[in-house]
Amino acid sequence: MNRLAVEIPGLSLKNPIMPASGCFGFGQEYSKYYDLNELGAIMAKAVTPEPRLGNPTPRVAETASGMLNAIGLQNPGLEHVLAHELPFLEQFETPIIANVAGATEDDYVQVCARIGESKAVKAIELNISCPNVKHGGIAFGTDPDVAHRLTKAVKNVATVPVYVKLSPNVADIVSIAQAIEAAGADGLTMINTLLGMRIDLKTRKPIIANGTGGLSGPAIKPVAIRMIHQVREVSNIPIIGMGGVQTVDDVLEFLIAGADAVAVGTMNFTDPFICPKLISELPKRMDELGISSLQELKKERTNQ
């Protein structure tokens, strides 16, 4: 038995570690550094129906223990991704999780209905942190009813399992998670970035041209752990955890809190080899902590 293996809807993972969406592109650059078959899965960059240029620069800023970004979902659009990006990933055994974004419910439905045409795509990650342009720009993921309706609409057309990425910028993460699970989601990914800002002391203006950006990196890990634990207390839905993972101990902390697998985001920019490093270090650390397998760790968590 593979002690690192994880089985969740649509995904047979050889290990629980994967790069998070937005920090790995579509994998081509990283494939020059290591074999992508080492990874448990790959969360690909967000896709929208039409190409997007993204936000004006500067759109990235370093912070203490993290970074801010306001990329604005820059991507080449659905048709280009299906024709040029996903075919490259089909040569690997590693399952691909396609991240889908949009400005309207119809945008999500359009992409989710077709993204599964690629044989590499084994699941969808629904980015519901996007502003809903038909409802005053409020993010889809901040209202349980809106999140429920969007999830249901996507489930009606998707040909692969659907994981919904939760925004931490809410008062009650549990009610959002429960609404999404009730709509038929196959799993959750959590958490997305926290809204933040940095000010340039000389210009007296925000460093990010957009004003605000998403805070990621080690600074948000305690928030991610807390939210995953809260959701796991009330639900058995599969969870892919993320938010500030740097070390193998971070990986195990997420798994003990309630995640079934773990995604690494910002650290890919600091160390492009971070995912294979964590994968190679995990068995030894499990031995040191008396963890025979991730399957046993999950049983232990369930019985508490």
From Swiss-Prot:
Q: Where is the active site?
A: 130
Q: What is its EC number?
A: 1.3.1.14
InterPro entries referenced in this protein's UniProt entry, alphabetically: Aldolase_TIM (IPR013785), DHO_dehydrogenase (IPR050074), DHOD_1B (IPR033888), Dihydroorotate_DH_1 (IPR024920), Dihydroorotate_DH_1_2 (IPR012135), Dihydroorotate_DH_cat (IPR005720), Dihydroorotate_DH_CS (IPR001295), Dihydroorotate_DH_I (IPR049622)
Any note on cofactor binding?
Answer: Binds 1 FMN per subunit.
One molecular function GO term is: dihydroorotate dehydrogenase (NAD+) activity
* Positions bound to substrate: 45, 69-73, 127, 192-193
Entry's Gene3D superfamilies? Aldolase class I
Pathway(s) this gene product operates in, as recorded in its UniProt entry = Pyrimidine metabolism; UMP biosynthesis via de novo pathway; orotate from (S)-dihydroorotate (NAD(+) route): step 1/1
Q: Which cofactor does it need?
A: FMN
Coarsely, its chief localization is: cytoplasm
Partners and quaternary state?
Heterotetramer of 2 PyrK and 2 PyrD type B subunits.
* PANTHER family associated with the record: DIHYDROOROTATE DEHYDROGENASE (FUMARATE), DIHYDROOROTATE DEHYDROGENASE (QUINONE), MITOCHONDRIAL-RELATED
* Protein name (record): Dihydroorotate dehydrogenase B (NAD(+)), catalytic subunit
Please name the source species: Listeria monocytogenes serotype 4b (strain CLIP80459)
Highest lineage ranks of the organism? Bacteria, Bacillati, Bacillota, Bacilli, Bacillales
Encoding gene (name): pyrD
